[in-house]
Amino acid sequence: MAMFLDTEAKVSKLKKGRRKLWPLPGAPREKQTNVFKFPTDGNDSDEDTNTNSGSSSDGEDGLLTSSGSDSVFNSTDYFSTPEDSQNCTPSDVSDLSDSENLDFKPADVLHDSENSTSPKFITSLVSSDSENSGADSSEEEIEEFIKSKAKQSLQLDAKTEEITSEEDCCVQEDSYDSDGDDVEAFIRQRAEMAITKHKTKRTISTSDDEGPRKSRKKRASKRISSSDDSEDETPKTKMTGTPPLAGNSCYVWPWLN
C-alpha cells in the first residue's frame, strides 16, 4: 500500500558497529570468536596468576575483534610443557663401561689362535697387568712377565691344535666307516633283489604264457567279425545330387540320422 501513498515508509536500518576490514563498499567486517582456556595448576604463585589473567584479558580483547586470521592464541601461557627428559651423564657411561670390563673373561680369548699369537694381544695383557701392579714395577719384572705370558699362549696354541687335529681325524674315520657300511648294505640289497627276480622268471612255465595269449586272440577275432556283421546288416543311405523340391518323401535328409 505504500506505493499508492505519498508518505514514505519507515525502514528500520541495521546498526553496523563492527569495523570493516577494508574501506571499500561490501567489504567483510570483523567477526567474534570463542576462546577456550586450558586448565592450569592450582599451585602457581600469585604473580603467575596475575600475569596470566592480564594476558588472557588482553588476548580476549584482541580475539573478539580479530580479523579472521589463523592466529587464535596470542599467548603461550595456556600450554603446559612436558617435563625435561633425563639426559645421560658421562659418569653413568663410565660406570657402565667399568661393569662391562669386570664381566670380561680373557679365558675365551686365549682359545683363539689368531688373537693369542698376535703381538697386540700380548701387549694388551701386559698393559692391563702392569696398571694393576702399580708404577713401582721394574723393567726386568715386565720382561719376565712378557716371556711367561708368551710361553703360556704358545703352549695353549699347541694344545688346541693337537686337540682339533685329533677330533678331525676321529670324525673322518667315523664318516669313512659309516659310508662303507652303507655301500655294502646297498650292494647286498641289490644282489638279493636280482636273485629273487631271476627265480620268479624261471618258475613261470611256457604253457601258462600261451594260454592267455590264445584266449586274447580269439576274443579279438570275435570282436572284429561281430563289427563286420553289424556293418553289413545296417543299410547305407545314398545321397542324391540335389534334394527334390516337393512330392518325394523317400529322400533321407542327412541331419535326421
Curated annotation (Swiss-Prot):
Ranges of compositional bias, category Basic and acidic residues: 102-114
Start and end residues of each stretch annotated as Disordered: 1-178, 194-248
Biased composition, class Polar residues, residue ranges: 72-94, 115-126
Bias kind Low complexity: ranges: 50-71, 127-136
Top-level taxon of the source organism: Viruses
Compositionally biased intervals (Acidic residues): 163-178
Ranges of compositional bias, category Basic residues: 12-21
Family listed: Belongs to the herpesviridae BKRF4 family.
Descriptive protein name: Uncharacterized gene 45 protein
Organism: Saimiriine herpesvirus 2 (strain 11)
